[in-house]
């Protein structure tokens, strides 16, 4: 994770749509961080902070993001973040692959014709020690595509 943070710190990325980028980065040791460019500072410094989850808002300013509404430059999706955190708290004794899928399902969104960002297009559960990923497209939870990095193999 630290290596990825250092790599990103050498870039200044700005989304032309008026929103900025943020990334959730983890490694096999369990180090997970949200990495984002500070939207309140003119110099937009890169900030990396330990967090267990993130949705469509700046983690740096999560205290300024209220659920079920737009929150200006800070983003939206607090209710989905809260749903993920509830799953993680309920299963705090030990996360499993089922924990990941429970959290992804809890935070998924059905399409909403008046809100372009309200459609979960894909969900991915990464296994950083097994070097695998399970992918679900458009909330078809029973149709899992599996990928193995070590085997460079895709299965359905």
PLM segments and residue spans:
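Compact, glycine/acidic-enriched structural inserts
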Residues: 1-13
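C-terminal, well-structured catalytic/ligand-binding subdomain of enzymes
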Residues: 18-21, 26-156
């Amino acid at each position: 994770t630290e290596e990825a943070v250092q790599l990103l710190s050498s870039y200044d990325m700005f989304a032309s749509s008026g929103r900025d980028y943020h990334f959730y980065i983890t490694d096999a040791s369990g180090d997970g961080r949200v990495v984002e460019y500070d939207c309140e500072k003119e110099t937009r410094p890169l900030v990396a902070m330990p967090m267990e989850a993130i949705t469509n808002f700046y983690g740096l300013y999560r205290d300024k993001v209220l659920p079920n509404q737009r929150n200006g430059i800070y983003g939206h999706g607090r209710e989905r973040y809260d749903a993920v955190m509830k799953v993680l708290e309920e299963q705090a004794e030990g996360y499993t692959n089922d924990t990941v899928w429970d959290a992804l399902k809890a935070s998924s969104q059905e399409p909403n014709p008046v809100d372009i960002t309200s459609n979960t297009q894909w969900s991915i559960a990464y296994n950083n020690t097994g070097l695998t990923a399970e992918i679900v497209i458009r909330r078809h939870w029973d149709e899992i595509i599996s990928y193995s990095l070590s085997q460079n193999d895709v299965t359905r």
